């Protein structure tokens, strides 16, 4: 990307991205093109991170291990659903992922947990996500029973209108009362250590830029 184009992109992203400074946006753009590699920009060719490349970043950099959650995080970043994360989606996505307000993070986490995109988190969705995050005990005859119990306990705590599923309003109320419930169904945000390490590595003088 030529300097003029890069400057224009940096300015436009900085204007619309309240959590990053111009310098930080520039660093994230640099990192994006480092990760994508040398790709010639051509008409009709999408330059971006595909699902595997992005999941690799989530795993290696932010320690995520749950395939289902990583897949949903990818979809959360890939706003236009073209199967690829563009440089704009990368910067906007990281803005919430790394530095979002509680409101932004609640909206993001709810979208991640709403597996089928119907604006509710159903019992089935809770079951699938909690099943992945719990370790099975070899002695358990029916490990699913414990997960079903956990789903019922979670609903009791979070389902404020008692309709057997979680709307965003239910989820928001529960999280505002107890912020630990933000990632109730699995880690989909970076832990503080990964976040500070990532930022320390990326937000430095571009002249001494290394890949993360």
Swiss-Prot record:
GO terms for molecular function: calcium ion binding. GO terms for cellular component: cilium; outer dynein arm docking complex; sperm flagellum. It is found in: Cytoplasm, Cytoskeleton, Cilium axoneme; Cell projection, Cilium; Cell projection, Cilium, Flagellum. Ca(2+) 2 binds at residues 114, 116, 118, 125. Ca(2+) 3 binds at residues 159, 161, 163, 165, 170. Residues 65-100, 101-136, 146-181 form the EF-hand domain. Ca(2+) 1 binds at residues 78, 80, 82, 84, 89. One of its GO terms (biological process) is regulation of flagellated sperm motility. Keywords: Calcium, Cell projection, Cilium, Cytoplasm, Cytoskeleton, Flagellum, Metal-binding, Repeat. The keyword Metal-binding applies. Expressed in trachea multiciliated cells. PANTHER family: CALAXIN (PTHR23055:SF75), CALCIUM BINDING PROTEINS (PTHR23055). Component of the outer dynein arm-docking complex (ODA-DC) that mediates outer dynein arms (ODA) binding onto the doublet microtubule. Seems to regulate the assembly of both ODAs and their axonemal docking complex onto ciliary microtubules. Regulates ciliary and flagellar motility and is required for cilia-driven determination of body laterality. This is Calaxin. The lineage of its organism: Eukaryota, Metazoa, Chordata, Craniata, Vertebrata.
């Amino acid at each position: 990307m030529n300097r003029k184009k890069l400057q224009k992109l940096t300015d436009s992203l900085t204007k619309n991205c309240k959590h990053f400074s111009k310098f930080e946006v520039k660093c994230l753009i640099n990192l994006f093109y480092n990760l994508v590699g040398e790709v010639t920009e051509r008409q009709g060719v999408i330059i971006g991170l595909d699902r595997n490349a992005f999941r690799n970043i989530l795993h290696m950099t932010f320690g995520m291990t749950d395939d289902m959650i990583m897949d949903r995080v990818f979809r959360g970043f890939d706003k236009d659903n073209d199967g690829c994360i563009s440089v704009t989606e990368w910067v906007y996505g990281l803005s919430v992922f790394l530095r979002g307000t509680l409101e932004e993070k609640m909206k993001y986490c709810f979208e991640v947990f709403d597996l089928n995109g119907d604006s509710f988190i159903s019992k089935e969705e809770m079951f699938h996500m909690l099943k992945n995050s719990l370790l099975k005990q070899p002695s358990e005859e029916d490990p699913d029973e414990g997960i079903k119990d956990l789903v019922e306990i979670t609903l009791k705590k979070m389902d404020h209108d008692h309709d057997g599923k979680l709307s965003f309003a239910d989820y928001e109320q529960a999280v505002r009362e107890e912020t630990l419930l933000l990632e109730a169904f699995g880690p989909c945000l970076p832990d503080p250590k990964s976040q500070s390490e990532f930022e320390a590595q990326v937000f430095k003088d571009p002249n001494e830029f290394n890949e993360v």
